[in-house]
Amino acid sequence: MLKVIAEDFIKPEHLDTVLPWYAELVEKTRQEPLCIAYDLYVDQKDPGHFIFVEQWPDQAALDAHCQTAHFTRLVPQINAYQAKPSRVLLMDAF
């Protein structure tokens, strides 16, 4: 089992632009057959700090997710509005 914690840092002036893209990314990812969990949270103290908590059966499933049409279209659009680079933490179940 693979758990992913991914953080995005969006410039505050671009939140209205990226929020619909995040909503679409979450909706379509949750429909992927190998997606176990895919949740997006917003930091209460920093509305530009988004945290994905994902669960996949294995690395191959995550790799397949990263090749989907919605991921390859939406993530570069979102990344254009980053205040700083994303952080991704991959963890195996203990």
Label every PLM stretch briefly:
Residues 4-6, 33, 84:
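Structural detector for hydrophobic anchor residues on beta-strands
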Residues 10-12:
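Beta-strand elements of well-folded, non-transmembrane domains
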Residues 30, 57, 83:
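Short conserved AdoMet
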Residues 21, 41, 65-68, 77:
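Residue-level signal for well-ordered alpha-helical positions
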Residues 2, 40-46, 76-94:
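Glycine-rich beta-strand-turn "strand-cap" elements at beta-sheet edges
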Residues 2-8, 39-66:
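Short, well-ordered beta-strand segments in beta-rich or mixed alpha/beta enzyme
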Residues 14-36, 70-74:
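Short amphipathic alpha-helical segments
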